[in-house]
């Protein structure tokens, strides 16, 4: 894009009546970031740090953003974060916009964002060829083939999936790229859906607390986790 990408975006012809067709578009989301900057005088990083990242435990100084030619952070993708960062964000949605007792997102917004607002990818010729791209789209969040399941979906298979009926989240960071486009990440989703079908029905009963097992799991997770690398210039 050029330095005048905002003007070019606004001058792009609209081929369909608004609300009648879905075409994957990242510039539209980046334009929302430009609106935030216009209204607040802050870029996305500086705006979100005290309002979101700090509140849900994301180390904002460790994030890396791709930028537009005018220096604004890309709003439609290009933020490099850890798997745990992604999980924290979608945990906020899974809990209805509340984090440790503090409301961060409105309940109404979360309900709309995580439910079908349009028939996604209505033109298959210009959308990634993956079955889970044709289930529906909320506000920056994709619906999934298993009923009630939704996901955040980044480039090359960065998925954070919410299973509301099971009170469960699953975050994946991978590099599923190739000439087949969306078909590569779709294989990961297909595998997850097969695994989901093999699970017993979710129970509505609360299991008794098992302190010993919980402590064992915490110790195990500490050994599995990798320390977040500090942000630094790219190596040669």
Spans of features found by a protein language model:
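Catalytic-site signature segments of enzymes, centered on catalytic residues
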Residues: 1-77
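Active-site rim elements
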Residues: 18-22, 73-78, 149-156, 176-183
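Short, gly/Ser/Thr-rich active-site loops of penicillin-recognizing serine hydrolases
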Residues: 180-236
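Active-site Gly/Thr loop motif
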Residues: 3, 60-63, 111-171
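Non-transmembrane alpha-helical segments in soluble domains
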Residues: 6, 10, 33-37, 45-49, ...
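Active-site-proximal alpha-helical segments within enzyme catalytic domains
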Residues: 28-35, 75-98, 110, 158-175
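Active-site-proximal binding-pocket segments
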Residues: 53-115
């Amino acid at each position: 894009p050029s330095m005048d990408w905002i003007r070019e975006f606004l001058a792009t012809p609209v081929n369909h009546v608004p609300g009648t067709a879905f075409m994957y578009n990242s510039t539209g989301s980046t334009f929302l970031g430009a609106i935030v900057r216009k209204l607040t005088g802050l870029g996305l990083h500086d705006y979100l740090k005290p309002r979101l990242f700090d509140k849900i435990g994301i180390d904002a100084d460790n994030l890396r953003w791709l930028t537009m030619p005018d220096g604004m952070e890309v709003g439609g993708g290009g933020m490099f974060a850890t798997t745990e960062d992604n999980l924290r964000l979608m945990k906020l949605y899974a809990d209805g916009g509340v984090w440790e007792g503090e409301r961060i997102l409105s309940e109404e917004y979360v309900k709309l964002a995580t439910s079908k607002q349009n028939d996604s990818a209505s033109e298959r010729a210009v959308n990634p060829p993956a079955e889970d791209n044709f289930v529906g789209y909320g506000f920056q969040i994709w619906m999934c083939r298993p009923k009630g399941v939704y996901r955040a979906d980044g480039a090359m298979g960065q998925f954070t999936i919410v299973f509301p009926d099971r009170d469960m989240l699953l975050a994946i960071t991978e590099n599923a790229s190739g000439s087949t486009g969306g078909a590569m990440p779709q294989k990961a989703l297909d595998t997850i859906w097969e695994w989901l079908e093999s699970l017993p029905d979710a129970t509505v009963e609360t299991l008794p607390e098992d302190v010993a097992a919980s402590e064992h799991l915490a110790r195990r997770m500490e050994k599995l986790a990798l320390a977040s690398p500090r942000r630094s210039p790219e190596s040669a």
